[in-house]
Structures are given as C-alpha cells and as structure tokens.
C-alpha cells in the first residue's frame, strides 16, 4: 500500500519567526515522530512552502495580514531543520504563492496513493486549503495531524 505524507508549510516563520506560535514546536515533534515510526520504503513524502516575495505587503494577502513572512530565499521561508532528514534531491517541494497549490493538485493526478496523511502548521488556513486538491475517489484514507 502506497502512502503519501504531505507536510504543509512547516517553515521557520511559522515556528519561531514572524508568525510563530507557542505550540508549533510540539507539532514539529509530532511530525518527526510520525515519519520516524510510520514511513515505509514505498511511501512518499512531499512538502509545501508558503512562498511570498518582497512585494508581499502590496498583495491581497499582505493587505489583510500585514506581517511579512515566508519571503522567498530567507531563513523564515526554509523548511525547519528537524525535517531535513526527509528532504532529498528528488523530494517534491511545492512552493505556494497562494493558499492552495495547483502544482500539487497536478502532481497528485499523476500518482496512485492509497492513503494520504497531511500534517502541517496553521491548520485552519494552510493545511485546510490544500484538502480540495486531495479528492480522488480511490483514496482509501485521509489522515490529518
């Protein structure tokens, strides 16, 4: 059974940066524990990155949330170091300039996963907005951490 582990926006700015929050490090620890204990050789791990640019404050999101974060190429934009063991040169990483990722949706159309486990930060925005991209009739199970 082929399983996808989707890690959504686990970036420095959401842990200890501009939009960091107290429990973020606990979420990172749970994700690490899940990958260490559940990941099988046939499974796939993908990452998404919230991605903005220097003009962020001029964008629709920046006007509504005027806190620069996850600016492309900065420390805050990088995926947290704790997850680096699961990032290989072939690991799919989807940069998202908006809440969801069309590129991720297109990737999923080409794959045959039996299960998807989605984990990440800012669940009420970043994680949830990626769920519509996951609808495929053949998915047996969709887990949310």
Locate predicted features.
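Active-site acidic carboxylates
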Residues: 1-93, 143
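Short, glycine/serine-rich, charged loops/turns that create anion-binding
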Residues: 11-12, 52, 98, 123-125, ...
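Short, well-ordered secondary-structure micro-motifs
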Residues: 18, 57-59, 104-106, 129-130
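Histidine-anchored nucleotide/phosphate-binding helix
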Residues: 32-37, 128-139
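Short acidic/polar active-site loop segments enriched in Thr and Asp
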Residues: 43, 114, 140
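Internal catalytic-core helix/loop-beta-alpha segment
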Residues: 73-127
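General structural signal for secondary-structure boundaries
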Residues: 103, 138-141
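A short glycine-rich beta-strand->turn/loop micro-motif centered on a GG-aromatic cluster
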Residues: 117-121, 140-145
């Amino acid at each position: 059974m082929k399983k996808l582990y989707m890690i959504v926006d686990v970036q420095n700015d959401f842990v200890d940066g501009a939009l960091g929050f107290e429990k973020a490090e606990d979420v990172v620890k749970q994700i690490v524990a899940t990958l260490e204990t559940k990941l099988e050789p046939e499974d796939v791990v993908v990452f998404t990155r919230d991605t903005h640019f220097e003009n962020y404050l001029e964008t629709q999101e920046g006007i509504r949330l005027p806190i620069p974060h996850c600016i492309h190429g900065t420390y805050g934009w990088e995926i947290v170091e704790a997850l680096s063991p699961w990032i290989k040169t072939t690991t799919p990483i989807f940069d998202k300039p908006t809440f969801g990722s069309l590129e991720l949706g297109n990737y999923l159309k080409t794959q045959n996963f039996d299960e998807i486990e989605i984990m990440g930060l800012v669940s009420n925005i970043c994680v949830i907005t990626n769920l519509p991209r996951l609808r495929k009739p053949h998915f047996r199970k969709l887990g949310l951490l």
